[in-house]
């Protein structure tokens, strides 16, 4: 541990062996609170490399139980969170809609730290059992194409280090790791990050982890694809990374103000979700979710481009199938 800290104090990147050793110690609770705080702050000040992030994620995955084997190329749209803008839960609503369209969504998530409603909070408030056992999870997934994996159930180091991380008053490597350590190891990811500068780093980390297809995005300071501002994207495709910007025009959708996405409490988040699924949501809410579903369809090769994905999603919402689909998920999650 002394050597690892010394390297970080001198602003040196850790090699693969050092990262693996460090996170194995963290998992096994062999690192004191003072040492963990020092490591996280030193990594933050130095700047985490994509190799450090990917090796840390690999180490955490090696210690996480895999609930079942689907045999499919699963999709996740978990983001880092941490943008602090208190918007509706775009990614979770998008995952529910995408799964109702047949996409195999393995949603990894946790409770909110900086928003009114994280993925776990929203699903729980909707009535979903967020702590499904492996049998329940597999059954729900097979019948609905949707499964929610509550991060603290699979990664105890996240749960146990949470109080210390909160006391640091800054984002750490743990924020980056959350979307990379889904125990079902999805091969397709739409990953939102809280800072534009992280897009390329996280795309490289996904590539190193063996993800086949991905888009890492930061839209106007949020960890989502948005319509109120430019969305910066790094797309992992054919083992290469394409970097570009997206605007509302790329989706053939009108722009909306960020303020229209912001909510005051968890109940507003629940109502926004239900309204969108019943095709009676505010246009500003519905359209930003549609843009994110369209991106999932594009990444999954179900739509040839983003505009086609938008059209497919809008037509699907008219059927109100997403709402009945949610009721099925709720029922099966408790079965």
Swiss-Prot record:
Cofactor(s) of this protein: Mg(2+)
Presence of the UniProt keyword Acyltransferase in the record: no
Entry binding sites for anthranilate 1: 79
Binding annotation for 5-phospho-alpha-D-ribose 1-diphosphate: 79, 82-83, 87, 89-92, 107-115, 119
UniProt-listed InterPro entries: Anthranilate_Pribosyl_Tfrase, Glycosyl_Trfase_fam3, Glycosyl_Trfase_fam3_N_dom, Glycosyl_Trfase_fam3_N_dom_sf, Nuc_phospho_transferase
Domain of life from the UniProt record: Bacteria
Pathways involved: Amino-acid biosynthesis; L-tryptophan biosynthesis; L-tryptophan from chorismate: step 2/5
GO molecular function, one term: magnesium ion binding
Cofactor binding remark: Binds 2 magnesium ions per monomer.
Residues bound to Mg(2+) 1: 91, 224
A GO CC term assigned to this protein in UniProt: cytosol
UniProt entry tagged with the keyword Magnesium: yes
Residues that, per the record, bind anthranilate 2: 165
Quaternary data: Homodimer.
Summary of the function given for this chain in its UniProt record: Catalyzes the transfer of the phosphoribosyl group of 5-phosphorylribose-1-pyrophosphate (PRPP) to anthranilate to yield N-(5'-phosphoribosyl)-anthranilate (PRA).
Protein name as annotated: Anthranilate phosphoribosyltransferase
Lineage: Bacteria, Pseudomonadati, Campylobacterota, Epsilonproteobacteria, Campylobacterales
Gene that this polypeptide is encoded by: trpD
């Amino acid at each position: 541990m002394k050597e690892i800290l010394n390297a970080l104090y001198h602003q040196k990147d850790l090699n693969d062996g050092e990262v693996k050793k460090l996170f194995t110690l963290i998992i096994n609770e062999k690192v004191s609170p003072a040492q963990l705080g020092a490591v996280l702050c030193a990594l933050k000040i130095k700047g985490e490399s994509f190799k450090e992030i990917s090796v840390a994620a690999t180490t955490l995955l090696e210690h996480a139980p895999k609930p079942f084997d689907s045999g499919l190329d699963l999709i996740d749209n978990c983001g880092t969170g941490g943008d602090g803008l208190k918007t509706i839960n775009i990614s979770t609503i998008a995952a529910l809609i995408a799964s109702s369209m047949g996409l195999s969504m393995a949603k990894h998530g946790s409770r909110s730290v900086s928003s009114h409603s994280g993925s776990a909070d929203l699903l729980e408030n909707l009535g979903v059992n967020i702590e499904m056992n492996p049998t329940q999870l597999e059954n729900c997934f097979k019948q609905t194409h949707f499964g929610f994996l509550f991060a603290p159930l699979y990664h105890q180091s996240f749960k146990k280090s949470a109080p210390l991380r909160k006391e640091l008053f800054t984002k750490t490597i743990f924020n980056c790791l959350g979307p990379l350590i889904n125990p079902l190891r999805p091969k397709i990811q739409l990953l939102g990050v809280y800072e534009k500068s992280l897009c390329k780093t996280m795309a490289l980390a996904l590539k190193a982890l063996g993800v086949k297809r991905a888009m890492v995005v930061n839209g106007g300071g949020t960890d989502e694809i948005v319509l109120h501002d430019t969305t910066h994207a790094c797309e992992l495709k054919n083992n290469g990374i394409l970097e570009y910007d997206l605007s509302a025009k790329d989706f053939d959708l009108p722009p909306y103000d960020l303020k229209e996405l912001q909510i005051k409490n968890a109940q507003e988040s629940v109502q926004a979700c239900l309204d969108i699924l019943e095709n009676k949501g505010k246009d500003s809410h519905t359209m930003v979710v549609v843009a994110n579903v369209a991106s999932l369809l594009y990444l999954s090769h179900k739509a040839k481009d983003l505009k086609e994905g938008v059209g497919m999603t809008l037509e699907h919402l008219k059927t109100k199938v997403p709402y009945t689909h949610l009721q099925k998920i709720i029922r099966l999650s408790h079965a």
